[in-house]
């Protein structure tokens, strides 16, 4: 009996040592989750500035705070993290844009409003988790995103293909709430403001909407 107990004790120690040796470092492992997990909602307010293909060669002021090219905006987004590093987000933003070539005068704001919305599907990369490993108690996260979608001018009743990209930084202020700042660009086909453009190359006929945004993220579970 004593020999049997000794053999069982030795086997137990050996198995424990083996399990300890093969335990992976979960900090950098890739883990997926159920469909109901890790959803989030975001609401934000932004300042956006428009740079169109039609203004090329007219020497207009480039400041993003000029009245003829900038306006405030709002946004709403819903998304899900599929792994700690990769997620998807559907983002709707607008409402007040500008048609920069309205009268070629950078001293007036009259007549160049362009109400719009942009709907994008974006892939999000959590760079903090990607390069430093996942930590549940991390306060600050840095992310990047890129995507595509569609924009619509409600003023001119036109649609335009849209590409988007940017950086996103968030700070956890409660268990399920974070404050974020985001800087990004939406680059539209030229007909987002009902203009034809002046360049031969299609990439030069695009209207670019740069924005800086602040908002809140609510984690749903």
Enumerate the language-model features and the residues they cover.
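Bacterial Sec-dependent N-terminal signal peptides
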Residues: 1-23
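Outer-membrane beta-barrel biogenesis signature
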Residues: 18-42, 127-142, 220-221
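Short glycine/proline- and aromatic-enriched beta-strand/turn motifs that initiate or cap beta-hairpins
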Residues: 20-77
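Residues that define the transmembrane beta-barrel architecture of outer-membrane proteins
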Residues: 37, 68-74, 113-119, 140, ...
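Residue-level detector of the transmembrane beta-barrel scaffold of outer-membrane proteins
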Residues: 40-42, 87-89, 143-145, 178-180, ...
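Residues on the lipid-exposed face of transmembrane beta-strands in outer-membrane beta-barrel proteins
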Residues: 43-45, 76-80, 121-127, 146-150, ...
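Gram-negative (and chloroplast) outer-membrane scaffold detector with strong preference
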Residues: 84-162, 173
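Predominantly the C-terminal beta-signal and adjacent terminal strand-loop region
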Residues: 97-103, 174-221
């Amino acid at each position: 009996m004593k020999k049997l107990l000794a053999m069982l004790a030795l086997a137990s120690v050996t198995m424990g040592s083996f399990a300890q040796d093969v335990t992976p470092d979960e900090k950098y492992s890739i883990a997926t989750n159920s469909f109901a997990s890790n959803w989030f909602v975001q609401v934000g307010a932004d300042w956006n500035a428009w740079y169109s293909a039609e203004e090329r060669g007219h020497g207009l002021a480039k400041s993003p705070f000029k009245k003829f090219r900038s306006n405030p905006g709002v946004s709403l987004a819903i998304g899900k993290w599929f792994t700690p590093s990769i997620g998807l987000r559907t983002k709707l933003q607008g409402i007040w844009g500008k048609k920069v070539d309205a009268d070629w005068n950078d001293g007036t704001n009259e007549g160049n409003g362009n109400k719009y919305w942009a709907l994008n599907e974006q892939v999000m990369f959590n760079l903090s988790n990607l390069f430093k490993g996942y930590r549940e108690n991390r306060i600050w996260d840095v992310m990047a995103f890129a995507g595509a979608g569609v924009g619509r001018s409600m003023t001119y009743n036109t649609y335009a293909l849209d590409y988007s990209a940017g950086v996103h930084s968030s700070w956890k202020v409660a268990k399920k709430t974070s404050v974020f700042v985001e800087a990004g660009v939406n680059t539209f086909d030229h007909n987002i403001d009902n203009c034809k453009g002046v360049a031969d190359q299609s990439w030069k006929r695009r209207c670019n909407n740069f924005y800086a945004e602040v908002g809140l993220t609510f984690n749903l579970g």
